[in-house]
Regions:
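Primarily recognizes the serine-hydrolase "nucleophile elbow" in alpha/beta-hydrolase
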Residues: 264-314
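C-terminal motif of bacterial Sec signal peptides marking the signal peptidase cleavage site
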Residues: 15-18
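The feature captures the conserved acid-bearing segment of alpha/beta-hydrolase catalytic domains
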Residues: 301-370
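Active-site machinery of serine-nucleophile hydrolases
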Residues: 103-105, 109-111, 115-126, 146, ...
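Extracellular mucin-like PTS domains
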Residues: 24-66, 70-71
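Conserved acidic catalytic loop of the alpha/beta-hydrolase fold
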Residues: 244-265
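Catalytic-loop region of hydrolases
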Residues: 69-187, 288
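Bacterial signal peptide processing site
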Residues: 20-22
Length: 371
């Protein structure tokens, strides 16, 4: 199997693991036998193992470490009172009539999937911390400076309700190119479609909507690509991205009849790659304990340091170097890392390595690239 295919296969196994692990209040996970090798710092794929060419056959096996028994902590309940209510508009059909976000080189309808776009409007908060953020990830933050916003989400799911497996992956769309991209959909869409997942892409950051300094990508930012369609969108800045993402995930949980076409989710998992993984790292440490929106997190190709909690024009609150994953959430957090993420300039994840726990796992995949 090529490294890129292996990455995709493990990525989907991680998604399945998060859902399987959060399906009950407590579950016991058996040992992984030869599939994974463990060190005090991390759990890595064994490059010489036969299993390295074929992912684990069960989510429980793929999560397990060398410990004979691992107990997943009690999953906390979703706190609707800690998340603002959004107004949903859509499906959106205005403007040029096309959703500005690539789905791949095929027609979703040919595989029994639909795609719709919705606008979410509400009031989001930024976050602040009275104390400097520490490397442990056990941060205490408070909401501040609320601001109105309107963003968009894209929903892809099975047309036939009977094929829906109950799992929803909510992807923090990546804006490194100056416009919205969905790299984790690109990695995992074949297996997601086969298994019956719903995928939701969230425009959480300002650049994807308003554009930025990238001259090549500016024309594909939403407001530039289709001013008539995306004219109503408003983004107050990336300090608000965390709460916007929370509210989008909460809407999937509470307004599924409209957003998911009547498909009721059993598990809602947050995913994100590269810059989005940096954001998710900070989200897990700062915001997740406040809201408990998601049943698990797949943090794909991050570096040693999380994204800033807050930034200009609000107070600058950078993440510490390194930024570890807090271990007290009670839901799975899976770090999936390429070899580039470990050693690449500006990434250096080796500084953020931490021991595996009942809820935190790290998968390092030899021979693979960041993107």
């Amino acid at each position: 199997m090529r490294p890129s295919s292996l990455t995709a296969a493990l990525f989907v196994a991680a998604l399945c693991t998060a859902c399987a692990s959060s399906s009950s209040s407590s579950s016991t996970v058996p040992a992984a036998s030869a599939v994974l090798t463990s060190s005090p710092a991390t759990t890595s794929l064994a490059a010489t193992s036969p299993a390295a060419t074929s992912p684990a056959t069960s989510p429980a096996t793929s999560l397990a470490s060398a410990n004979p028994q691992t107990t997943i902590a009690l999953q906390p309940e979703f706190r609707a009172d800690a998340v603002g209510t959004v107004t949903v508009s859509g499906p959106i059909t205005s403007g040029k009539g096309a959703i500005v976000l690539g789905a791949g080189g095929f027609d979703l309808s040919t595989v029994g999937y639909t795609q719709d776009e919705y606008f979410l409007s509400g009031s989001a908060s930024a976050y602040t911390s009275a104390a400097p953020l520490t490397s442990t990830g056990r941060w205490t933050v408070t909401p501040t400076s609320p601001a109105d916003y309107t963003t968009r989400i894209v929903v892809r799911g099975p047309k036939d309700p009977a094929t829906f497996n109950g799992n929803v992956a909510v992807e923090w769309l990546n804006v490194s190119a100056g416009f919205d991209n969905s790299p984790d959909w690109s990695y995992a869409h074949v297996e997601m479609i086969r298994a019956g997942w719903v995928w939701v892409g969230v425009s959480a950051q300002a650049v994807g909507i308003l554009g930025g300094g990238n001259s090549l990508g500016a024309a594909l930012a939403l407001k530039a690509a289709d001013p008539d369609r995306y004219g109503p969108l408003v983004h107050p800045g990336d300090s608000y991205s965390y709460d916007i993402f929370s509210q989008a995930g909460a809407a999937v949980r509470t307004q599924w009849q409209q957003l998911l076409g009547g498909l009721q989710p059993r598990h809602v998992v947050a995913i994100g790659e590269s810059q989005s993984a940096f954001r998710l790292s900070t989200y897990v440490d700062a915001i997740a304990p406040i809201t408990n929106v998601f049943d698990g997190y797949l943090v794909h190709s991050r570096g040693a340091v999380g994204a800033a909690l807050s930034q200009a024009p609000l107070a600058d609150i950078p993440a510490p170097d390194p930024t570890l994953v807090r271990t007290d959430l009670g839901v799975p957090v899976l770090n999936v890392l390429s070899e580039t993420d470990l050693l690449g300039k500006g990434l250096g994840y080796t500084r953020a390595r931490q021991p595996d726990t009942a809820s935190v796992r790290t998968w390092e995949i030899p021979g693979t690239a960041h993107a």
